[in-house]
Amino acid sequence: MKDYLVRGLVNSKNCRVFACQTTNLLEEARKDHDLWPTASAALGRMMSATLMMAAMNKNNEKMTVTINGGGPIGTMMAVTCGDGHIKGFVGDPHVHYTYNDTGHLAVGVAVGTQGSLQVIRDMGLKEPFCGTVPLQTGEIGDDFSYYFMASEQTPSVVSVGVLVEETNEILASGGFIIQLLPEATEEDITYIEERMKDFPAVSSLINEGKTPEEILKMLFEDVEITDHQDLFFTCDCSKDKILNALSTVGKEELQSMIDEDHGCEITCQFCNTKYKFDEEELQKLINRL
C-alpha cells in the first residue's frame, strides 16, 4: 500500500484529525542512511509527525523540524514543503537501544531529553516563524504534543509509531493527531481521553493492514474525511545547489581543496548522494567569487 495522509473533521466531538502511513518512505530513508532499528523508529516518528503538522496549513509553506535531546542519536532534522514530499536525517544512524522490561525500541534513550524541539515555518515573508520547546520524553509523540500546547495553544493527542523487522526492514510506520477546536467541551475532552486509554499502538494497526481512514474511524465513527495527500521521501539536492553551498566557504578554503586534495567530494546529509568537484570546477567557482 502506498504512503498517504488524510485530514478529517469530527463535528460531534469538536476536533480535527490527521492520520498517515509512512512505511515506504521510511524504508527509503532507512536504505539511504543505513539506519539501525532505533534510529529508524526515531526518524520515522519524527517524519510522520512533521508531515501531519505540515498538512495543517494548505499554503505549502516550507517547514523544518529539528530535534536534539543530547542523546547518542545526535541532531535529527526533517524538511517538507507541505506537498507530501519530505527529507530527513539523524546524526548517528547506527543507534539501537531497547527497553529491558518491554523489549520496545528505546527512542527516548536514543534521543535524550536535555534539549529542544524546534519548528521553523517559512511562509515566504521577510522572517520565518520559529517556535522552540524543551523536550519532554524524547519519544517524539509526547514532544510534538507539548509543542502544540506550549507554542500554538492547541491541546493535541499525537500518536506516532514504527515497527521494524529483525532484518532491519520497516514493517509499519505512521501515526495520527487529534486536535481540539476552540469550541470543544469538557465532555469532548473526556471522551477523547477515555478513547485513548486502551487504543492499540498505531504501528500495530498499520502492520495489520489498517488504512489511515480506518484508524480514524476506529477513533470516531462519524469522522468526515476532507482531504487526501500522497507521501514520498525525496531529496531536492543537485550538483548546482551543492556548488552554491560551496561558494560560501570562501576563496582560501576552495584554493586549499585544489592544492591539497585536487578537488573535493561533498555528501548530501539528507540522502547520502555524493557529488564530486574537480580542480577545474573549483577554479571556475573561485573566479566567479
What are these regions (language model features)?
Residues 196-289:
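Cys/His-clustered metal-coordination modules, chiefly Zn-binding fingers
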